Amino acid sequence: MKYSKRTLMFFFYFSQRFLKTMKNIISYNVNGIRAAISKGLLDWLRIVNPDIVCFQELKAQTEQIPVLDFEALGYHTFWFPAQKKGYSGVALLTKTQPDNVAFGMNIPKYDFEGRMIRADYGDISVISVYHPSGSSGDERQAFKMIWLEDFLSYVNELKKTRPNLIICGDYNICHKPIDIHDPIRNATSSGFLPEEREWLSRFIDSGFVDSFRHFNQEPHNYTWWSFRANARSKNLGWRIDYEMVSKPIEPLMRRALILPQAKHSDHCPVTLEMDF
């Protein structure tokens, strides 16, 4: 079948338009960005070439990060480190200049730890968030539970003006038994406690889609492994990194994957492809 020049031009225009609107969003807890860079993070980014990157757990101040190296890859970069050196911190890298960037939740005790950054693109917002871990003891577990409730309140308020959200990051919670290698032995472990899992269910029920589970219901898909006992080589992991998508923009999702072959951290990246 032969197509007219006009038809071919239309197909070309449409394909280019489609390619330009498809975005690949990667979320990655790097467990120290300087250490990840030393393990080849920049070369990996150059090859994978995502449109938006959400980093968590920078463990570095902005002046300690080779920002120009990321900019050389074509990114506008936005960094929100913790005030405490060598701890926490989030970032958002983007090929497209956002309309607006918001740093933190305007709650000092959380913003001090560099937990959240948001970029707005038209009527869609992308958030990089690092939920606290409670594994160090009761005090931090209590802090985590308070944070979770405050974060949900923040999101519910944000949705009144910015209803189309993509919330990427390390949630430090496995949602269901399928998301952890040993749900029985870990039933009393921080990250799989009933109250944490109940919160994540409420979060999703408030109007979000777990993008990975939308496309994949298979077990043994994890995003974090302990450094102990060769856990990663044995795939004894936890799925605690998510890219949550607001229900109104669920139809824009095209694919969501876990990328365990990337080994710059004790986590691996997760990726989401969307039309916007």
Summary of predicted features, one role per range:
Residues 85-101, 219, 230-251:
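Conserved beta strand-loop-helix elements of the APE1-like EEP
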Residues 106-107, 132-148, 184-188:
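Surface-exposed cleft-lining segments at the edges of enzyme active sites
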Residues 28-29, 45-63, 126, 155-177, ...:
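Active-site beta-strand/loop signature of hydrolases that rely on acidic residues for catalysis
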